[in-house]
């Protein structure tokens, strides 16, 4: 490894000031890299901090490491790391933010705009940006080891030269005082495939931080039913038990009881949160209710909003002075976010979840809104000298809380299920749970597919779940199948009132649930490659040693049939009866409709063919003479 170190102090007189067009602080140091040119370190006010900068290589990737030290505890300075490389071959930029539309390569000049600025922190997205093109190569990929503190980052085009500018900016929001800090920024110029670039960046961050993924029980991959979209907050024990029996009859294995079990009404959405006890009029005996769902044949999980307490809860007076901030100024109706730096706050939350699993008998928890644990601009702890808190950093406290939750729940139930969802995703979150769900996008199969693919590339070995599926009750069977097919490469969650569902849709659900379970290993654990992120992933493939499953989501997508040594399934999710298939040899294709009925067989010649496959159905391919 080639190392270049610079120790800098505030005595630097010859600093270079950036222009307004560059939208960055003054350059205090530069360091040469092997493949990414000169990296710039920027900072407007170093204060008491000394900067040490080094560059090196890691498996052919350039890594710049910045360490800052102060002789006394102080607020860390705002600083940045910038790269400038050729823009050749870069047409799009991918980031993990599920609320951003498309894979835009924004101009550097637009950096200040909200939609062009990307942020990550412990429970918010992933510090990765990948520049790629329509051939699915990635000439530039950027990753940062900072997985806890807020980070602003991205890849941008220089309006004047079309060069790509990579930037990572640290401590743009206030943080707890410290004496030292270190981080690394990696730039990958190896021009690998898009999917590999995203996965490699994720692995690099995980390894750089020494993270260990949480154990993933096989049940985390089981299809499940959620009460959320079907019932919202209007849930009752008897009705949910009926739904559990319906779900089990269709092939679902787990149920999530979502919001509403703990409240009847409140002045605002969550102003009654915090006690986490069932409403007697809805769930008179939670333990007996859980047993009834188990009797139906399902595992059972419970939703909880981790950070919130409301002024209509019994614990409000106990914890109202141990919060990060309060929303609302009318009482009742105020909602507060707890401060996890207080040990008694963490203990209260952990004991709540222990009661859910240990006393009531739930098999797991859905832990919501942990992205709300954010230090406000003015840290309330500074006013009282951090009295009562056993750590100063909010991200550090959340990390400790989540690790302790998993440890103590696994002591009760070793195969406990713990679900999180976008946006609170990222390398650190992989340590705390074993299920990661797509962010809410009801009745939007395209968004569900895109977000599923993004999660599959960034979530390591944990089970990626779709957002809960809903569709119009008057859909055709083929139309009802499309939401399912769009997330076939994830663990599928359903959320419709099953007792009221269209009978034709029931057959669709039953068939595709059975299909997804027969091919579970290839779909959920195989070599997964989604294609053309710039177009929302128009076709997807995944395979294991025995079979290959490819799905087309656009009529003009060309699906590759792959090796003749595997059984090949081609899923038609285009909404038409045509799929373009590229086969290296002649094959026979056996056709099945959307409820699994065989409709015939045709011969496919080698090369590219327009193949007529039933709408929302599939073809099973085999070499001629072997079908």
Each predicted region: which residue ranges?
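Hydrophobic faces of well-ordered beta-strands that scaffold small-molecule active sites
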Residues: 221-227, 255-257, 300-304, 365-367, ...
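Active-site-proximal substrate-binding groove within the catalytic cores of carbohydrate-active enzymes
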Residues: 176-180, 401-617, 623-625
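N-terminal accessory beta-strand-rich subdomains and adjacent acidic, glycine-rich linkers
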Residues: 20-207, 211, 578-583, 588-591, ...
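An acidic-aromatic substrate-binding cleft motif
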Residues: 205-246, 250-254, 262-263
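Aromatic- and acidic-residue-enriched carbohydrate-binding clefts of CAZyme catalytic domains
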Residues: 261-286, 314-340, 372-399
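Active-site-adjacent "subsite" loops/lids of carbohydrate-active enzymes
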Residues: 215, 222, 229, 233, ...
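Glycine-rich, aromatic-flanked loop segments that form ligand/cofactor-binding clefts
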Residues: 196-211, 254-257, 282-333, 415-419, ...
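Active-site groove signature of glycoside hydrolases
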Residues: 251-261, 349-383
């Amino acid at each position: 490894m080639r190392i270049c170190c610079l120790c800098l102090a505030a005595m630097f007189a010859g600093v270079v000031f950036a222009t307004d067009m560059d939208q960055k602080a003054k350059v205090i140091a530069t360091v040469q890299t092997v493949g990414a040119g000169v990296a710039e370190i920027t900072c407007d006010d170093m204060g008491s901090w000394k900067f040490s900068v080094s560059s090196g290589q890691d498996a052919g990737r350039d890594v710049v490491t910045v360490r800052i030290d102060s002789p006394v505890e102080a607020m860390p300075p705002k600083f940045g790391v910038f790269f400038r490389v050729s823009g050749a071959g870069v047409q799009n930029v991918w980031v993990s933010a599920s609320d951003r539309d498309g894979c835009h390569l924004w101009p550097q000049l637009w950096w200040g705009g909200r939609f062009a600025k990307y942020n990550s922190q412990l429970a918010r997205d992933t510090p990765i940006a990948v520049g790629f093109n329509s051939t699915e190569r990635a000439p530039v990929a950027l990753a940062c080891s900072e997985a806890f503190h807020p980070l602003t980052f991205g890849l941008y085009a220089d309006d004047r030269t079309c060069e790509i500018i990579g930037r990572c900016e640290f401590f743009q929001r206030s943080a707890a005082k410290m004496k030292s800090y270190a981080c690394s920024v990696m730039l990958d110029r190896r021009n690998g495939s898009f999917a590999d670039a995203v996965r490699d960046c994720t692995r690099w961050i995980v390894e750089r931080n020494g993270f260990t993924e949480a154990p993933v029980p096989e049940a985390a991959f089981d299809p499940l039913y959620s009460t959320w979209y079907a019932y919202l907050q209007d849930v009752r024990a008897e009705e949910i038990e009926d739904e559990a029996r319906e779900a089990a009859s269709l092939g679902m294995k787990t149920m999530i009881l979502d919001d509403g079990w703990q409240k009847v009404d409140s002045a605002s959405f969550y102003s009654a949160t915090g006690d986490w006890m069932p409403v007697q009029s809805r769930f008179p005996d939670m333990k007996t209710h859980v047993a009834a769902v188990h009797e139906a044949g399902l595992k059972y999980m419970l939703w909880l909003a981790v950070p919130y307490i409301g002024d209509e809860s019994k614990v409000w007076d106990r914890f109202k002075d141990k919060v990060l901030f309060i929303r609302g100024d009318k009482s009742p109706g105020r909602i507060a976010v707890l401060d996890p730096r207080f040990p008694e706050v963490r203990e209260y939350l952990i004991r709540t979840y222990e009661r859910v699993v240990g006393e009531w008998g739930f098999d797991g928890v859905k832990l919501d809104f942990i992205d709300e644990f954010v230090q406000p601009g003015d840290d309330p702890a500074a006013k009282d000298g951090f009295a009562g808190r056993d750590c100063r950093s909010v991200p550090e406290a959340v990390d400790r809380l989540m690790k302790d939750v998993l440890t103590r729940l696994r002591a009760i139930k070793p195969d406990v299920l713990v679900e999180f969802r976008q946006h609170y995703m990222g390398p650190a979150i992989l340590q705390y749970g074993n299920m990661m769900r797509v962010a809410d996008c009801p009745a939007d199969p395209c968004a569900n597919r895109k977000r599923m693919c993004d999660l599959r590339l960034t979530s390591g070995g944990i089970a990626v779940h779709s957002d809960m599926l809903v569709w119009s009750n008057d859909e055709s069977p083929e139309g009802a199948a499309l939401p399912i097919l769009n997330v076939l490469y994830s663990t599928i969650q359903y959320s419709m009132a099953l007792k009221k569902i269209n009978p034709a849709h029931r057959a669709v659900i039953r068939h595709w649930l059975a299909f997804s379970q027969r091919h579970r290993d290839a779909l959920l654990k195989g070599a997964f490659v989604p294609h053309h992120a710039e177009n929302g992933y128009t076709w997807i493939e995944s395979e294991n040693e025995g079979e290959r499953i490819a799905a087309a989501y656009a009529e003009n997508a060309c699906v590759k049939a792959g090796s003749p040594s595997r059984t090949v399934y081609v899923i038609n999710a285009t909404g038409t009866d045509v799929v373009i298939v590229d086969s290296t040899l002649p094959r026979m294709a056996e056709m099945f409709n959307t409820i699994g009925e065989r409709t015939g067989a045709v011969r496919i010649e080698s090369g590219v063919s327009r193949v007529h496959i039933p709408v929302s159905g599939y073809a099973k391919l085999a070499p001629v003479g072997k079908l």
